[in-house]
């Protein structure tokens, strides 16, 4: 599978998630390789480790305000830290699960882990290509 098609898999997963879960379209910016400069990390980050033929991490990182509005769009009234953590992990898990449909059963995904704080760094192994898919939704930006 070409790199362009691999990226397209994640772009489609992002667009589908927002269309389905919050029933409001997101806009995906131009994906880019995050070489030399780490990507922006926001208040909450959900991470899924990938093993099998592909190795790496799929993550979704977003500001608290964006996640809160997403919960409201889902008719959720609980804006607790625990629920924000659940949501960011769910998004990362859904994006990974959708990608697994394209990549096949050798795209093995872990359960989500969640970290908070903008000082978090997302590490990657030297033999992976860190690709960032910028997401704009309403007035918010995420990766």
Predicted regions, residues:
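N-terminal auxiliary interaction/assembly segments of multi-subunit proteins
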Residues: 1-143
């Amino acid at each position: 599978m070409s790199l362009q098609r691999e990226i397209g898999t994640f772009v489609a997963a992002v667009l589908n998630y927002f269309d389905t879960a919050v029933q409001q379209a997101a806009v995906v910016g131009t994906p880019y390789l995050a070489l030399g400069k780490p990507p922006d990390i926001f208040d909450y980050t959900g991470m899924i480790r990938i093993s099998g033929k592909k190795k790496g991490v799929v993550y979704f990182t977003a500001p608290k305000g964006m996640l809160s509005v997403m919960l409201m769009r889902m008719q959720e009234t609980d804006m607790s830290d625990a629920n924000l953590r659940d949501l960011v992990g769910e998004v990362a898990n859904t994006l990974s699960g959708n990608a697994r449909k394209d990549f096949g059963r050798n795209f093995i995904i872990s359960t989500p882990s969640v970290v908070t704080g903008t000082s978090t760094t997302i590490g990657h192994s030297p033999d992976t290509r860190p690709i960032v898919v910028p997401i704009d939704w309403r007035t918010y930006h995420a990766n």
